[in-house]
Amino acid sequence: MTNIQKTHPLLKIVNNAFIDLPTPSNISSWWNFGSLLGICLILQILTGLFLAMHYTADTTTAFSSVTHICRDVNYGWIIRYMHANGASMFFICLFMHVGRGLYYGSYTYTETWNIGVILPFATMATAFMGYVLPWGQMSFWGATVITNLLSAIPYIGTNLVEWIWGGFSVDKATLTRFFAFHFIFPFIIAALAMVHLLFLHETGSNNPTGVSSDADKIPFHPYYTIKDILGALLLILALMILVLFSPDLLGDPDNYTPANPLNTPPHIKPEWYFLFAYAILRSIPNKLGGVLALVLSILILILMPLLHTSKQRSMMFRPISQCLFWILVADLLTLTWIGGQPVEHPYIIIGQLASIMYFLLILVLMPMASTIENNLLKW
């Protein structure tokens, strides 16, 4: 009798992707984050679905409906905080996953990488629109400030902003459309993730050495399924500790004040996972320049395959590049810190230096280090 998982048209796809997939025998825990991102996405879609059952996308009742979810709905508070903090876990996994790709040279799989660069953009757009929905002070002013950035686009900017707003300010029309988009986007992300996986399975996974592992492959199940389950348990443990002990740790207290267009909060800042990009935006005095730098801070990842000058794929045996990589990580942490600080001395100059350093590292120093390492190999 033939095995149904190998003959059934649907099960065959699942089998080839998650069970009999030939996988390098030496991939480390840094390769867990792909599956963790999948778990995060499923968790966000499920909790979001239950929240949408009780939420009303109207300026007069949105804030009250979120309060109602937390106070009156059965386990509404846990669903709400799992959704809010689940976004933070999602971005932690996303940053780790991208960092792994940079460190081990996974970007040489260009199709997989390019879809993988579109995914953070889609995720950031979704998270931004979701942050607007509770209709607190930071929701309203965050939406106003960030959408207003589009007005920096020459000629069509102002019309574009008013078109997105659905009026002359952030109002009911804006909230309704943001809710609609926030609902549909995770499914677009899921579709993109499937394409991402499709391209990955054309080439097979990379591994820490960056050398072809065709001679040494093992089946994905049971070896990596059990490893992924461990990662998933640790992820859920971290999420539940956050949700049950300090659910508001990563939130902004201003968002517990209902939105008021007549009263601007002293410091408008986005959620922590946008702060590095926000710091880059603020470090440039020109509005259009800032917006371009903001977009380029993530879009620059598209150039990674072109900027790869090393004869080796992975950074495993490249100490100079390793050093620069960890400086880049420290630089991003600095930018994240600066993004949450007020615009005053010395934060302005630190932010500007960190922003210059960010682009300098990726565009100049890392390719130079690779060239130096290539020459050192000749000795």
Curated annotation (Swiss-Prot):
GO cellular component: mitochondrial inner membrane; respiratory chain complex III
Annotated GO MF terms: metal ion binding; ubiquinol-cytochrome-c reductase activity
Cofactor-binding details, from the entry: Binds 2 heme b groups non-covalently.
Keyword Iron set for record: yes
Protein's cellular compartments: Mitochondrion inner membrane
Residues holding heme b b566: H97, H196
Family matches, as PANTHER family: CYTOCHROME B
Name under which the protein is recorded: Cytochrome b
The gene coding this protein: MT-CYB
